[in-house]
Amino acid sequence: AIIRRFDRTDDGGRIPYVSAATMLQSDGRDTVHAYTELVDVLLREGADPIADIHQLWRRLVLNFLICNTDDHLRNTGFLYDSRNHGWRLSPAFDLNPMPGDRRESKTWLTEDSGPIESRDMLMEGAPYFRLAAEEAAAIWTEVAQAVGSWRVVARGLGMQGTDLVDFEPAFA
């Protein structure tokens, strides 16, 4: 598939990009970092921190719901917003539904909690992401409804038959 690069302007110029690993001064291979550290980065250096923190939460919900266990620090990144002099969460990329894996994140939710293993764990972490329980629950419902239409999207992309059956456990 040919995709439009999110780190380029319409006229081909570069938009500065760094991975979450770079932002946390990590080589990306260690497993000691947490999403709450990215919240801290956004609060400190973000151009629109609350919007991006809420978007990060949505992605954690999506990753959990599609069993994306490839959520390491090199698969999250930031683009520099020169107009607002700060970093923005980049568009999501490299999302991999994994039908045979446990629903467990590579990156920890908080420095104390460990990998994300359940809806309850995510919901308990919502305050770190500046979300009230009701807001977090509403986001969960919205993302779950979108994920529920995965078959329609997959068929539209040409998936059929056994491919749909094979991927179903990731979305169950």
Predicted regions and their residues:
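Anionic ligand-binding catalytic core segments
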Residues: 1-73, 77-172
